[in-house]
Amino acid sequence: MTPIDAKRPLQLNDQGQLRHFLSLDGLPRELLTEILDTADSFLEVGARAVKKVPLLRGKTVCNVFFENSTRTRTTFELAAQRLSADVISLNVSTSSTSKGETLFDTLRNLEAMAADMFVVRHSDSGAAHFIAEHVCPDVAVINGGDGRHAHPTQGMLDMLTIRRHKGSFENLSVAIVGDILHSRVARSDMLALKALGCPDIRVIGPKTLIPIGIEQYGVKVYTDLTEGLKDVDVVIMLRLQRERMAGGLLPSEGEFYRLFGLTTARLAGAKPDAIVMHPGPINRGVEIESAVADGKHSVILNQVTYGIAVRMAVLSMAMSGQNTQRQLDQENAQ
């Protein structure tokens, strides 16, 4: 296994093209816009009788999910299949990692299968970055979510949802509500919104679920839902991540819903044409009431549809960036 050249930006090739997709941190606005534009072009594929394009024909994409996720894994599988790639999905519950094998050893064995791309989801922050640093240079790595750190494809599908429903980001007010502390989605959304020029990004939640120093992301912090939702264009609700919480951060789910649950009455404080989003899975009656989740403002199911197109864009762009870098390396070696 040969590490990537330390002088080269890990996510980009020498021409500034995507070769891994690990985080939205530091990626230029132009590249994020290119991902959105490419995803827009792929939405048409989903409406065809034969939902395939040959961009990744002959390539193998390996989904390595050390953490459960039905929605993310399924959309990555569909995205790769629609690009005509061969797809392998590792069932971690029956893999050698449950028998004590290290992440590094698992990586080496997967690499021996000659996959061209790994889509990695892991409960430890930085796992995808570690794999990208140590994998064979020809293999692209996509972060499907790592700990509390990042979920870049979710961030981009959220941006595509906002752009398709609201157009430009430059005059929007966006509220992110709920368990900010444990949410990799919140971090990715904040980075993307800032990079794309959104002037008013708000985070709303109890003090115990808002990270210290979050203002560095360029956001306004609210601990009152009614105040925070005033005149917003977009509301992004987050799931309470009980599995990541230590005791004492939250009195009860009922108390959270009483203070921070999105109801029809509370949504009335937002703009009349506001949209409501949620990365899923939804906890009805905890962070959102059914009348809102299923109502006219909800674009939650649209997010799922757009997610396939965004992941098609990321897979195809990263594979193209790897191919370009391989050609550059070969030319430089001559």
UniProtKB/Swiss-Prot annotation:
What enzyme class is recorded for this protein?
transferase
Question: How does this chain assemble?
Answer: Heterododecamer (2C3:3R2) of six catalytic PyrB chains organized as two trimers (C3), and six regulatory PyrI chains organized as three dimers (R2).
Give the range the annotation lists for the signal sequence: none
This one is known as Aspartate carbamoyltransferase catalytic subunit
Job description of the protein: Catalyzes the condensation of carbamoyl phosphate and aspartate to form carbamoyl aspartate and inorganic phosphate, the committed step in the de novo pyrimidine nucleotide biosynthesis pathway.
Q: What is the lineage of its organism?
A: Bacteria, Pseudomonadati, Pseudomonadota, Gammaproteobacteria, Pseudomonadales
Q: Gene3D superfamilies from the xrefs?
A: Aspartate/ornithine carbamoyltransferase
Catalysed reaction, written as an equation:
carbamoyl phosphate + L-aspartate = N-carbamoyl-L-aspartate + phosphate + H(+)
